Amino acid sequence: MLKASLLSFVAFTAQVAHAAFGITTSSSAYVIDTNAPNQLKFTVSRSSCDITSIIHYGTELQYSSQGSHIGSGLGSATVTATQSGDYIKVTCVTDTLTQYMVVHNGDPIIHMATYITAEPSIGELRFIARLNSDLLPNEEPFGDVSTTADGTAIEGSDVFLVGSETRSKFYSSERFIDDQRHCIAGDAHRVCMILNQYESSSGGPFHRDINSNNGGSYNALYWYMNSGHVQTESYRMGLHGPYSMYFSRSGTPSTSIDTSFFADLDIKGYVAASGRGKVAGTASGADSSMDWVVHWYNDAAQYWTYTSSSGSFTSPAMKPGTYTMVYYQGEYAVATSSVTVSAGSTTTKNISGSVKTGTTIFKIGEWDGQPTGFRNAANQLRMHPSDSRMSSWGPLTYTVGSSALTDFPMAVFKSVNNPVTIKFTATSAQTGAATLRIGTTLSFAGGRPQATINSYTGSAPAAPTNLDSRGVTRGAYRGLGEVYDVSIPSGTIVAGTNTITINVISGSSGDTYLSPNFIFDCVELFQ
């Protein structure tokens, strides 16, 4: 018994024994030992830059059949590894991309950054860690909504039916402003992607993209720096990151990771704190029941912050330049301005704005840039519209004054629930000229609203900008946020009962939930 215990102790000690911090070089690979207490050691191919092995606490976590890498792999690259004091830097260079992997002595973290001068040929910029799904089966924080193992594809190659539930890797998404950390985990290991810098990504604070996907063969942990997934702006070049892959035994790591040491490591495109400035001020005027966000952007960078409850704000440290500055209530823009940022200083800039309509006859929803409260909005981020857990899409009739907000659909699909009907009662004082304002958040296949008020049909609006991306079926609701005004002639509205129908129109067609559609933000009738 004593002998068996001694052997077990020796085996355990050997498993967790610390090796020296450093690089072991072979003809084909660099092996990087972080000297972390929980033993993190990984191998990088010298020909492709793929991570081909990740050993954490004595256990191989890397998927054996395919590496972890940028995009779908660089194919070939010039790969070097250097050590300087307590830091090791792996550099992978192609004609248009440089990938950095950095470790600090004693830390169980692979810090990364990606510098580009052109968009990758696959049309998106992402890092994907392909890890052992037996050891790391779970996805955090949203659970199995993106676990597609053993599923049957029901839309394209990325939406699946697993048992009675629809699932997709897209259902793992979180708004950039709220996504500082996402993880995959098992009983003995947790791997988290820590994201403290989105400045070179695209889409703004409310954009969202794939975070994880357990497809069975491996569990994928992503950071999408940009993609064509409901993308609303051009891609940015330059340095993306730093972003950090953190390995732990248990517990969720802090998102407060200091990567200022990048300034001393000759990282192309890295701008240290001393070369940055800030914007501080007060936002005012918007609906105080909602979160307020201030957003800055130009062709080179983007930043954002929530304001305090009083409206005060200070931006993150920003690259110098002139920025468009936007103030949101929820996700609805209420003011736009411009500000110039200089290195080493803080610029004071206040901003004010509110939603302006008129004398409201009725309002369905709120001007928050989201389909908040509408039917199926609470589920749409995490399941397909066809899911049995969804409520009936209709067609629905909403009666002002008596219907619940959930009696109004978050989206109208040309082949599913078209049209939406609104019934309301007007007084004689409300029969004059009026405006029906229809706020939308996202359009698919040219879908846009055309309204009929009693016997009067408003003109057909022009087609919105085509983002060329599935949206509502893949858990997205935010696009360009088109708002449509219907001018209603005096006498169209009558004293008593009135009926409005809102049809989705488009020159395109499609089946069920891939038919032309749009998502509602708010509908307001005012004079």
UniProtKB/Swiss-Prot annotation:
<dbReference type="GO" id="GO:0030246">
    <property type="term" value="F:carbohydrate binding"/>
</dbReference>
<feature type="disulfide bond">
    <location>
        <begin position="49"/>
        <end position="92"/>
    </location>
</feature>
<keyword id="KW-0119">Carbohydrate metabolism</keyword>
<dbReference type="InterPro" id="IPR016590">
    <property type="entry name" value="Rhamnogalacturonase_B"/>
</dbReference>
<keyword id="KW-0732">Signal</keyword>
<dbReference type="InterPro" id="IPR008979">
    <property type="entry name" value="Galactose-bd-like_sf"/>
</dbReference>
<dbReference type="Pfam" id="PF14686">
    <property type="entry name" value="fn3_3"/>
</dbReference>
<dbReference type="GO" id="GO:0102210">
    <property type="term" value="F:rhamnogalacturonan endolyase activity"/>
</dbReference>
<dbReference type="GO" id="GO:0045490">
    <property type="term" value="P:pectin catabolic process"/>
</dbReference>
<comment type="similarity">
    <text>Belongs to the polysaccharide lyase 4 family.</text>
</comment>
<dbReference type="InterPro" id="IPR013784">
    <property type="entry name" value="Carb-bd-like_fold"/>
</dbReference>
<feature type="disulfide bond">
    <location>
        <begin position="183"/>
        <end position="192"/>
    </location>
</feature>
<dbReference type="Pfam" id="PF09284">
    <property type="entry name" value="RhgB_N"/>
</dbReference>
<keyword id="KW-0456">Lyase</keyword>
<dbReference type="InterPro" id="IPR029413">
    <property type="entry name" value="RG-lyase_II"/>
</dbReference>
<dbReference type="GO" id="GO:0071555">
    <property type="term" value="P:cell wall organization"/>
</dbReference>
<dbReference type="Pfam" id="PF14683">
    <property type="entry name" value="CBM-like"/>
</dbReference>
<dbReference type="InterPro" id="IPR029411">
    <property type="entry name" value="RG-lyase_III"/>
</dbReference>
<feature type="signal peptide">
    <location>
        <begin position="1"/>
        <end position="19"/>
    </location>
</feature>
<keyword id="KW-0624">Polysaccharide degradation</keyword>
<dbReference type="InterPro" id="IPR011013">
    <property type="entry name" value="Gal_mutarotase_sf_dom"/>
</dbReference>
<dbReference type="GO" id="GO:0005576">
    <property type="term" value="C:extracellular region"/>
</dbReference>
<comment type="function">
    <text>Pectinolytic enzyme that has a positive effect in the apple hot-mash liquefaction process. This endolyase hydrolyzes the alpha-L-rhamnopyranosyl-(1,4)-alpha-D-galacturonopyranosyl glycosidic linkage by beta-elimination, thereby generating oligosaccharides terminating at the non-reducing end with a hex-4-enopyranosyluronic acid residue.</text>
</comment>
<keyword id="KW-0964">Secreted</keyword>
<dbReference type="InterPro" id="IPR014718">
    <property type="entry name" value="GH-type_carb-bd"/>
</dbReference>
<feature type="glycosylation site" description="N-linked (GlcNAc...) asparagine">
    <location>
        <position position="350"/>
    </location>
</feature>
<dbReference type="InterPro" id="IPR015364">
    <property type="entry name" value="RhgB_N"/>
</dbReference>
<keyword id="KW-0325">Glycoprotein</keyword>
<keyword id="KW-1015">Disulfide bond</keyword>
<protein>
    <recommendedName>
        <fullName>Rhamnogalacturonate lyase A</fullName>
        <ecNumber>4.2.2.23</ecNumber>
    </recommendedName>
</protein>
<keyword id="KW-0961">Cell wall biogenesis/degradation</keyword>
